[in-house]
Amino acid sequence: MSNSKPEFIGIFGGTFDPVHKGHTEIIKNLFELIPLDKVIVIPNGIPPHRQASVSSEERLKMVSSAFKSSDTVVIDNREIKKKDPSYAISTLRELIEENPEHSLVWIMGSDAFAEIDRWYQWEDFIKMINIIVMVRPNHEIPMESVAYKLLQKSHTIDKEELSSGKEKILLLKIRPIEISSTEIRNKIYKGSDVSEFLLEEVNELINKGNLYQ
């Protein structure tokens, strides 16, 4: 039996293709607004319907370099290593089993949450975990969506509730990200300078590997 102190851990997945300053700013915002002990960052495997821009290993290397100076961010490569499609519920089950003494909260953007009913076994997923939905200014969850009905049932404004129990959903307003990974890839392809959007270490990896060209 472990004697480790129970922790409040955020789980933040993404394709990170590439990881940029917007992603690192989100993590910074989360620690400022939510009493998290650490955040597990999980680079996703490329979904079957999308052609990879760069290899999974290169994305993992960029994410690792972006957060290498943080003591409170852990990079988890389990989905990158899997050859089969990775589903959020499978990853969550593994993390719950690995962290029986800790409280976990899943972190996602409002666009992803608005389509939660398209996730594999989504009804089981939401019963297993509390969720933080990061909401951009002026973005609303469509009233006709399943996600909106979930909010009617499970919405909380009490951040303390997230560290216990399950099935609670907190809407968290964050500073908007001014750039997307898609825009960065397009700019690199066109030969534009993207250094203002990337951490220096990530920019160096992209230039050194001639990625996204």
Stretch-by-stretch model annotation:
Residues 1-213:
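Nucleotidyltransferase catalytic core that binds NTPs
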